[in-house]
């Protein structure tokens, strides 16, 4: 199994903490790319394009800590409540995610335990340990999703003031 997250350590007293729930397009071995083509795995449906590099670059530049999910949102969406139906999507922007269709409760729970919970535990520990003044969840937005209207936003930042 691949790691469910990648931790970047900066100065512990730094007031800024960055994290990326959708920064990776990685589908671990054993999931047969969820039945998708390589082209689909490079599209915005698999990840927030460019955010891993932005998070890494900003963390290095500011010497702050960061956390990056190590799996694609198509495997399990780290930015969803575990009870939500969209936690493991069966479709994304008109594309069927065959490896997620009719997933049984045991397989769903295995993904939660192997990827979702470790990532969120690491996120919670980082926020507790670092006590940042500003946590930024970094996301990117495709200007025109296949089935959507034109977006006029290149980078989205969800701010959590602590």
Positions of the model-derived regions?
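N-terminal catalytic or cofactor-binding beta/alpha core of small enzyme domains
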Residues: 1-160
């Amino acid at each position: 199994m691949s790691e469910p997250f990648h931790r970047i350590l900066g100065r512990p007293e730094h007031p800024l903490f960055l994290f990326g729930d959708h920064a990776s397009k990685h589908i671990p071995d054993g999931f047969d790319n969820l039945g998708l083509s390589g082209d689909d795995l490079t599209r915005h449906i698999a990840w927030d394009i460019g955010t891993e590099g932005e998070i890494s670059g900003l963390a290095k530049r500011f010497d702050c800590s960061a956390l990056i999910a190590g799996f694609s949102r198509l495997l399990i969406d780290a930015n969803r409540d575990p009870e939500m139906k969209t936690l493991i999507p069966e479709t994304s922007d008109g594309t069927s995610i065959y490896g997620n269709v009719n997933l049984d409760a045991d397989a769903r729970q295995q993904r939660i335990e192997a990827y979702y919970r470790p990532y969120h535990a690491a996120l919670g520990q980082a926020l507790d340990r670092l006590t940042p003044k500003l946590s930024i969840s970094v996301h990117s937005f495709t200007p025109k999703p296949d089935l959507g209207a034109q977006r006029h936003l290149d980078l989205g930042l969800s701010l959590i003031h602590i």
